[in-house]
Amino acid sequence: MDQTLSDFGAVFVFLLLGTVFVVGGYLTARLLRPSRPNPEKLAVYECGEDAVGTSWVKFNIRFYVVALIFIIFDVEVVFLFPWATVFKQLGEFALIEALVFAGILIIGLAYAWVKGDLDWVRPTPNIPSMPQPPQKEK
């Protein structure tokens, strides 16, 4: 019991000292820095050029979908790499688990493909127009 308490005490001291150093560094920098704001320092810096337009730019949702799909398969590689390094020691059950894991991700990729999220240039949809009722003459 005493050994466990001393181990947790070391972790607590480490966290406490880390917090003290971070807060102390922040406060020291805040107290010692010069504060001389002027319009030139407060202006938006954009690669050495004057800013044009606003910074609120609307991005197409396809950027986010492609980024999420990339992150999902990047994380898959992170999970499968340790499995691949010790594959012979784990046996058939681990192989089946890895295949199920990859299969679930492949089903998700197929769903995104069928839905059209992987098509960068989408064709314009052909929406049939509804016939308009005749207008009454006044």
From Swiss-Prot:
Reactions the enzyme catalyzes: a quinone + NADH + 5 H(+)(in) = a quinol + NAD(+) + 4 H(+)(out)
InterPro entries in the record: NAD(P)H_OxRDtase_bac/plastid, NADH_UbQ/plastoQ_OxRdtase_su3, NDAH_ubi_oxred_su3_sf
Transmembrane segments: 8-28, 63-83, 93-113
EC number(s) recorded for this UniProt protein: 7.1.1.-
Cell compartment(s), UniProt: Cell inner membrane
Main localization category: membrane
Bilayer disposition of the protein: Multi-pass membrane protein
Enzyme class, spelled out: translocase
Molecular function (Gene Ontology), one example: NADH:ubiquinone reductase (non-electrogenic) activity
Keyword Ribonucleoprotein among record annotations: no
Assembly behavior: NDH-1 is composed of 14 different subunits. Subunits NuoA, H, J, K, L, M, N constitute the membrane sector of the complex.
Family according to the record: Belongs to the complex I subunit 3 family.
Name assigned to this protein: NADH-quinone oxidoreductase subunit A
